[in-house]
Amino acid sequence: MSSDTSQAVITTPPPPSMPHKERYFDRINESDPEYLRERNMSPDLRQDFNMMEQRKRVTQILQSPAFREDLECLIQEQMKKGHDPTGLLALQQIADYIMANSFTGFSSPPLSLGMVTPINDLPGADTSSYVKGEKLTRCKLASLYRLADLFGWAHLANTYISVRVSKEQDHIIIIPRGLSFSEATASALVKVNIIGEVVDQGSTNLKIDHSGFSPHAAIYSTRPDVKCVIHIHTLATAAVSSMKCGILPISQESLILGDVAYYDYQGSLDEEEERIELQKVLGPSCKVLVLRNHGVVALGETLEEAFHYIFNVQMACEIQVQAVAGAGGVDNLLILDLQKYKAFTHGVAMTGGGGVNMGSHQKWKVGEIEFEGLMRTLDNLGYRTGYAYRHPLVREKPRHKSDVEIPATVTAFSFEDDSVPLSPLKYMAQRQQREKTRWLNSPNTYMKVNVPEESRNGETSPRTKITWMKAEDPSKVSSGTPIKIEDPNQFVPLNTNPTEVLEKRNKIREQNRYDLKTAGPQSQLLAGIVVDKPPSTMRFEDDDQGPPAPPNPFSHLMEGELEEYTKTIERKQQGLDDAEQESLSDDAASVSQIQSQTQSPQSVPERLEENHELFSKSFTSVDVPVIVNGKDEMHDVEDELAQRVSRLTTSTTIENIEITIKSPDRTEEVLSPDGSPSKSPSKKKKKFRTPSFLKKNKKKEKVEA
């Protein structure tokens, strides 16, 4: 192949059927002044404008009075429900209020199309005319309308649910005509009296259906114990109401209903004779009323009990319709013995929650636990029912020993600063330290066991080796509290400001970086205890009041004198003992003179003066000057003399001679005619070894001579 053919590039044109993709510039007009202003705007300024728009929407939501009142209601409900340390339920309800969308994982209602109207809309309505407990009752009734819509019980005509809110005044709440069950809210309900006169119109302008309200009013006037009435006529209930046999005892649901009353309903209960007949049919305890060829009515002392009966009636009617159609007639069905099963089944259902009250401390009313579960489902779907739960779904976790009040296990491992990036090499280098820390903080307790070693032959060796084994009873081995630390903030108190925690941590780390001497942490147990310490011995500090320190004897020596003194010490160490012997002989002669002086006490002062002159000459012969330390020079010289002659060793034959020198004052005291000494004896015998620098050197005496 040629070079021209090898360099040729083959391009494929796009298919003609490809649709034209709309671009960004096709949707805008470049001559638009708004577009030109945004285009010429700096990116930072454009971002600031976008943030301002977002904050504006958030500010509008936060400043709305409806949001504020609803938030207060949520907080009050959360406080009544129990202690929830995290507060996730309240935050979830706030998110439901802002977004008003269905939660992920739950199917949206068919009529809501992903958006639902909140049931509890009372914070924005006027509630001054409400009686005690009416807010909660309105929320329950509106929630029950929503449940009837979700279950498919809604009907466009004569299907209503009513609740009596005031037994003294006979005020009844019902939904107005023209408002569907899916639109029912707490504020949209209408409050009327027993004869149908409007007491509170609610948030709508719709009126009630008097023909549909007449059965409710008749039942309330007949049965003072009834608080809620639910009237439905679904396909199953209407079909069973048209059967001569009525509700057959062929299922558990039919046995739960108890006594069932039947009444020939003609469309209204306005006449007095009809109401008297209804009162005879219902009796004092009947909770289910079948209206012939019309539908079913369920009664209850509470709203939860009425829902319990209407739900079981609907299920029993559906089972009966399916059973009759499948069996080919009532004669082919197995009818249960009412005398044998009805009392037991009805009694279990009346205990509340299907018998969950047996052996439990919490007593549930009839149908309350099931209704609370349905309200929780509606709240999860975003309906915001406003229902006051008796018990939250999530049980509070038991307090573990690794909570805040128990301190952490002390280790020497410290975490790196969050602001400083950690290199991979340093991270790998600290791997061993992290493994050690994890082992130290392990909740397992180990004990040291000596295990005999095994030799290569398989025989047991007399030597032992140390092995760490897990202790079965930690209380006998460990005295601490081993805690497995999984989170660095495990012991940080809850509901604290993270900024304050970081500032406190950084402050502690700054103190650790500097070598500060402090008294350490103060014990909380020993803080109030006072310890009586014995008085310590007095010590003089370096101040003006203390006694002066002795001066340095070498401070006045010249360099030459110090060198000669050093050489003298070196000669002595080398074994030059002849000079020492001569100096000792001279010292012995002086000692003999002193002994003669002590034998004649009358001439002691004169002899002392002569000895003083002799000693001064002998001191000058030595190159080391004498430093006088004391008040009186005479007394110091005598002290030096006593120190010199106290311990002299002339030879092996000459013994140590102890000489006591008395001062002139002491001599006068002894020789005083009165015999009473003027001063107390303060000086005692002193025994010192003659310093080496005071000994005479024979060679130096010859040089001086």
Curated annotation (Swiss-Prot):
SUPFAM superfamilies according to UniProt: AraD/HMP-PK domain-like
Signal peptide: none
Site, as annotated: Cleavage by asparagine endopeptidase (AEP): 357
Region of interest called Disordered, as start-end residue ranges on this chain: 1-22, 472-495, 535-556, 572-612, 658-705
GO cellular component: brush border; cell cortex; cell-cell junction; condensed nuclear chromosome; cytoplasm; cytoskeleton; membrane; plasma membrane
Principal subcellular localisation of the protein: cytoplasm
Single GO term (MF): actin filament binding
Biased composition (Polar residues): 1-10
Residues found modified as N-acetylserine: 2
Documented effect of changing residue 572 to Q: In strain: Milan normotensive and FHH hypertensive; no constriction of afferent arterioles in response to increased pressure and impaired renal blood flow autoregulation resulting in kidney disease in both strains; redistributes from the cell membrane to perinuclear location and disrupts the F-actin cytoskeleton in the kidney and renal vascular smooth muscle cells of FHH; elevated membrane expression of the iberiotoxin-sensitive potassium channel alpha and elevated iberiotoxin-sensitive potassium channel current in renal vascular smooth muscle cells of FHH; proteinuria, renal interstitial fibrosis, alterations in gromelural capillary pressure, increased permeability to albumin and impaired glomerular function in FHH after induction of hypertension
Annotated Basic residues bias: 681-705
Modified residues (Phosphoserine): 31, 42, 64, 402, 414, 423, 442, 461, 583, 585, 590, 672, 676, 678, 680, 682
Residues in cross-link Glycyl lysine isopeptide (Lys-Gly) (interchain with G-Cter in SUMO2): 484
Expression (tissue specificity): Expressed in renal interlobular arteries, afferent/efferent arterioles, parietal glomerular epithelial cells and microvilli of the luminal surface of the proximal tubule (at protein level). Expressed in podocytes (at protein level) Expressed in renal cortex (at protein level). Expressed in primary vascular smooth muscle cells (VSMCs) of the kidney (at protein level). Expressed in tubular cells and glomeruli (at protein level).
Annotated localization: Cytoplasm, Cytoskeleton; Cell membrane; Cytoplasm
Family label: Belongs to the aldolase class II family. Adducin subfamily.
Protein name: Gamma-adducin
Organism (species): Rattus norvegicus
